[in-house]
């Protein structure tokens, strides 16, 4: 019997941490199961995956690709050229690497790579993170072997026979966050036993959330609440002056497990990764959907929870006036905290990564027969 060749897998996508970290979680789970597997990432040149993926121990190729700007921009004139150039480079990558499967996790690079893989006869799989599918994934769904989703009723967008309900991949240290509870407050320079609000706006930051907190810091201090405030890299320099004994300001948090462990209430954008992590840790949260995303998918993500009393939602336009007031209200209301915590846990899928990897190898092994 001939020796089976190592599995060769391409994972494509990125642009934000919300796409990159789930992709790395999938890669890590594949490596844990089959250590000799060869994994290649394909991302967008100049985006954060070009640093984060090598830091996680994987090789990555970059495509000259970006999204269409909503405002009139010279960059938009180059978009068709970028798509064509990226497609042909993706074809070359696929033909050289010869993958058993190509996985798209969303982000600019996902579309040309999966199109190239489909055209080359390579099996493909989409991991759709949001409750509202984007244009690219809807177009790709016609040819992929499977679509791993995190929300119900995705038959609105995809062929029902291809949908696999897996949940979104989350890093193992987040799933095991309770192990990091001891010493979590002191890790961030905060005091145990004091009501703690954790504010996060994603790796790049959220202007409206930051403005809302900045305007109302005195109210939070006067209420006896301490704050861990993750500003994002674009806003940190202008906000670091507020760092104090009870307000800890940071641009980025690597130890999200500890941040979740010590938080009583969390304020967050409503990206798919954030919601998946919040569901697993089961902490009461207030979601402020970003209005600057395709198809307004963050609002749809947030509504999926708020309609089930699994989160509170504050519209971005209302956040400067309402967000901190809502946070103070929730910090004082133990019954509301309990209800939100109980309901958001029903959305948790701690085994999502393993479910996705199971489907990946089911497809590969079927094709290898």
Swiss-Prot record:
GO terms for cellular component: plasma membrane. Pathway: Cell wall biogenesis; peptidoglycan biosynthesis. Coiled coil: none annotated. It catalyses: di-trans,octa-cis-undecaprenyl diphospho-N-acetyl-alpha-D-muramoyl-L-alanyl-D-glutamyl-meso-2,6-diaminopimeloyl-D-alanyl-D-alanine + UDP-N-acetyl-alpha-D-glucosamine = di-trans,octa-cis-undecaprenyl diphospho-[N-acetyl-alpha-D-glucosaminyl-(1->4)]-N-acetyl-alpha-D-muramoyl-L-alanyl-D-glutamyl-meso-2,6-diaminopimeloyl-D-alanyl-D-alanine + UDP + H(+). It is found in: Cell inner membrane. GO terms for molecular function: UDP-N-acetyl-D-glucosamine:N-acetylmuramoyl-L-alanyl-D-glutamyl-meso-2,6-diaminopimelyl-D-alanyl-D-alanine-diphosphoundecaprenol 4-beta-N-acetylglucosaminlytransferase activity; undecaprenyldiphospho-muramoylpentapeptide beta-N-acetylglucosaminyltransferase activity. Its EC number is 2.4.1.227. It holds the Pfam family Glyco_tran_28_C. GO terms for biological process: carbohydrate metabolic process; cell division; cell wall organization; lipid glycosylation; peptidoglycan biosynthetic process; regulation of cell shape. The keyword Transport does not apply. Keywords: Cell cycle, Cell division, Cell inner membrane, Cell membrane, Cell shape, Cell wall biogenesis/degradation, Glycosyltransferase, Membrane, Peptidoglycan synthesis, Transferase. It is a peripheral membrane protein. It comes from the Bacteria. It is an enzyme of class 2 (transferase). UDP-N-acetyl-alpha-D-glucosamine binds at residues 16-18, 130, 171, 203, 253, 298. NCBIfam families: murG. Belongs to the glycosyltransferase 28 family. MurG subfamily. Cell wall formation. Catalyzes the transfer of a GlcNAc subunit on undecaprenyl-pyrophosphoryl-MurNAc-pentapeptide (lipid intermediate I) to form undecaprenyl-pyrophosphoryl-MurNAc-(pentapeptide)GlcNAc (lipid intermediate II). HAMAP family: MurG (MF_00033). This is UDP-N-acetylglucosamine--N-acetylmuramyl-(pentapeptide) pyrophosphoryl-undecaprenol N-acetylglucosamine transferase. It comes from Cytophaga hutchinsonii (strain ATCC 33406 / DSM 1761 / CIP 103989 / NBRC 15051 / NCIMB 9469 / D465).
